Curated annotation (Swiss-Prot):
PROSITE patterns: TIM_1, TIM_2. Involved in the gluconeogenesis. Catalyzes stereospecifically the conversion of dihydroxyacetone phosphate (DHAP) to D-glyceraldehyde-3-phosphate (G3P). Belongs to the triosephosphate isomerase family. Pathway: Carbohydrate biosynthesis; gluconeogenesis; Carbohydrate degradation; glycolysis; D-glyceraldehyde 3-phosphate from glycerone phosphate: step 1/1. The gene is tpiA. Substrate binds at residues 9-11, 172, 212, 233-234. It comes from Clostridium perfringens (strain 13 / Type A). This is Triosephosphate isomerase. It comes from the Bacteria. GO terms for molecular function: triose-phosphate isomerase activity.
Length: 248
């Protein structure tokens, strides 16, 4: 049985004080959640948020990291730095990183491997553009991403990866894939994982939906057989909204 996982990606929002205020509001609202709850603040807020959620059921993730151990990479954060802070998760290959920062599948693959080397669980993002959806190449596009991003992992590692299916056309646009569309694509992703690592691994991998997830859409999505959670953007910035999603 897969434990559902709902993660809030705060993107480039909130100072340290604002971030701590948000988790303090969130804590009592999600304490009885039946799913795993993760918040992903900016790098500067990670330490304060990690301390604020100590002893609760809320886990903490980073939004990105470099794949190298250390070195002359101005502005970057190494996996071992996140490990030293006891961070639980790291988002890898978000469409905004791929689009604005030229992140490639090769880079994502290195980051996924680096995450495992440092006791971090990757939340690996994949998804198609509106043009790709309309011309019927969704599965081809995602298969190319998944195959490249997970290449070289052991079965033990592969089953721990959290995959977030985020149709790029539904991020921050207010457009949402229908729950049937999302479930269909997520089932296809599970089949891709099975092809690479076997059905047993595929049955353990948790696959989230991410793309304008809202309190009023989550229940229908979570009722689908292959959807194991959500990667939430805007709605995770308000404690009451995120709690409503978590307590679907």
């Amino acid at each position: 049985m897969r434990t559902p996982i709902i993660a809030g990606n705060w993107k480039m929002h909130y100072t340290i004080d604002e971030a701590v205020k948000l988790v303090e509001e969130l804590k009592p609202l999600v304490k009885d959640a039946k799913c795993e709850v993760v918040v992903c603040p900016t790098f500067v807020c990670l330490d304060a948020v990690k301390k604020a959620v100590e002893g609760t059921n809320i886990k903490v993730g980073a939004q990105n990291m470099h794949f190298e151990e250390k070195g002359a990479f101005t502005g970057e954060i190494a996996p071992r730095m996140l490990e030293a802070m006891n961070i639980d998760y790291v988002i890898i290959g978000h469409s905004e990183r791929r689009e604005y920062f030229n992140e490639t599948d090769e880079t994502c693959n290195k980051k996924v491997k680096a995450a495992f080397a440092h006791n971090l669980t990757p939340i690996l993002c994949c998804g198609e553009t509106l043009e790709q959806r309309e011309n019927g190449t969704t599965n081809d596009v995602i298969k190319a991403q998944i195959t490249a991003d997970l290449e070289g992992l052991t079965k033990e590692q592969a089953e721990k990866v959290v995959i977030a299916y985020e149709p790029i056309w539904a991020i921050g646009t207010g457009k949402t894939a229908t729950s049937d569309q999302a479930n269909e694509t997520i089932a296809a992703i599970r089949a891709m994982v099975a092809e690479m690592f076997g059905q047993e691994v595929a049955d353990k991998v948790r696959i989230q939906y991410g793309g304008s997830v809202k309190p009023n859409t989550i229940a229908e999505q979570m009722a689908k057989s292959d959807i194991d959670g959500a990667l939430v953007g805007g709605a995770s910035l308000v404690a009451a909204d995120f709690a409503q999603i978590v307590n679907y």
